[in-house]
Amino acid sequence: MQAFAVAALSIWLCLGATTLAESLAQSHGPQHCTSPNMTGVLTVMALNGGEIKATGHYHYDTTDKKLRFTESDMHLNKSEHLEDYLMLFEEGVFYDIDLKNQSCRKMSLQSHAHALELPAGAVHQVELFLGSDTVQEENIKVNIWMGSVPETKGQYSVSTTVGDCLPLSTFYSTDSITLLFSNSQVVTEVKEPEVFSLPSFCEGLELEDTHNDFFSIFNTV
């Protein structure tokens, strides 16, 4: 827990954040918020080695809790096929899709928690400015939240923008993994809703009962 707190604090300092408001213990703080529909780029880094685990485009449907992530071919360290995931959080299912070979696996998701939605149990910590103290137009006001995922025994720190609740980054840690998820080039709409349609070769598959969750999936890519 101590290592988690130190790492989370280091991330905030590296962002050059300036404290705007006091902690939740000294104020009521904002209410839990919900992400909008989003299209953007998600980058995943393993902090214990500095390795880029994955980077690619995603679409997120906040109403139906669906996520499609397609790894970018610019991720040059990949020796195998580029990852393509369809995650259905409400159903507790995700599909590992290989469009090139028209193959697919249907697997269970252990947890609904992920990096593009503030988890239900998140507790507000502080409100911050990211950017310049003097040039207000360059500032981004963010909320920092922390919490744990009981199903995975993991802990997280999430930064979301004030107002529209865009998740900018998520730090996630367990005894075995330490990951940083960075969200960029965000548009608050799903431009291609058809990406959530299941390819025909994925239909009718038997569900594989696994211990996968959003975070462990990206740790193993």
Curated annotation (Swiss-Prot):
Residues making up the signal peptide according to the UniProt record: 1-21
Record keywords, A-Z: Calcium, Disulfide bond, Glycoprotein, Secreted, Signal
GO BP terms, alphabetized: cell-matrix adhesion
GO cellular component, one term: lysosome
Post-translation changes: Binds calcium through the terminal sialic acids.
Localization in the cell: Secreted
Chief place where the protein resides: secreted
GO MF term set: calcium ion binding
Known tissue expression: EPDs are synthesized in the meninx and secreted in the cerebrospinal fluid.
Assembly with partners or alone: Forms disulfide-linked dimers.
Main function: May play a role in neural plasticity. May be involved during axon regeneration.
Protein family membership: Belongs to the ependymin family.
Name the UniProt record assigns to this protein: Ependymin
Organism: Esox lucius
Organism classification: Eukaryota, Metazoa, Chordata, Craniata, Vertebrata
Gene field: epd
